Amino acid sequence: GRTLNKLEVIYDEIESLGAPQPAILPLQLSSASPRDYELLVDTLDKQFGRLDGILHNAGILGERTELANYPTDVWDDVMAVNLRAPFVLTQELLPLLAKSQHASVVFASSGVGRESRERWGAYSVSKIAIEAVSQLFAKENVHPNIRYNCINPGATRTAMRAKAYPNEDPKTLPTPDAIMPAYLYLMGDDSLHMNGQSIDAQD
């Protein structure tokens, strides 16, 4: 979730399961400074000592319009959240990922990240680029214990989907919970053999 209240609900759910105590470390991805990333890494290092994985799931849609008329400020915002933030976060967190026995970095992709479509603008460009980022991290990897993959959630019942397809009946779409097994697969040890791949959550 983007709000502290939503994060606190997840925090409480994790604690209720008897899992290790989590931490809430908010970071505004659209405007984070190098110092913000440094503080995040330092805090994670002090509290946990290592990082077993990253799921880069934050994203914004931008505008559904032609590139010829695409607002540059919206373009910059989409690129900051969808492309720059996951790249910088991964780069900064590499030392903590390297301390894990098996670390998994998962980037959120999209159908328009495989093939561009008209009027998807910055969102499509950012997702095509994030697929390349994942592949390059995988190919250039100097830490054999870290793997990098992409996942395309497909048509899912989310606010972003409703914004992109306002005339679509959301009840016809699977919920995020329904596709969660695919995410858990990529984050867990069952996918140790996968690196530099891109999968569809609904296949």
What are these regions (language model features)?
Residues 40, 65-67, 74-76:
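Substrate-binding pocket helix/loop in short-chain dehydrogenase/reductase
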Residues 143-146, 150, 158, 167-203:
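C-terminal helical subdomain
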Residues 14-33:
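Rossmann-fold cofactor-recognition segment
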Residues 27, 57-63:
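Conserved NAD(P)H cofactor-binding loop of Rossmann-fold oxidoreductase domains
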Residues 90, 126:
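Active-site helix of classical SDR
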Residues 110:
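Residue(s) in the substrate-gating loop at a strand-loop-helix junction
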Residues 115, 136-146:
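Active-site-adjacent segment of SDR/Rossmann-fold oxidoreductases
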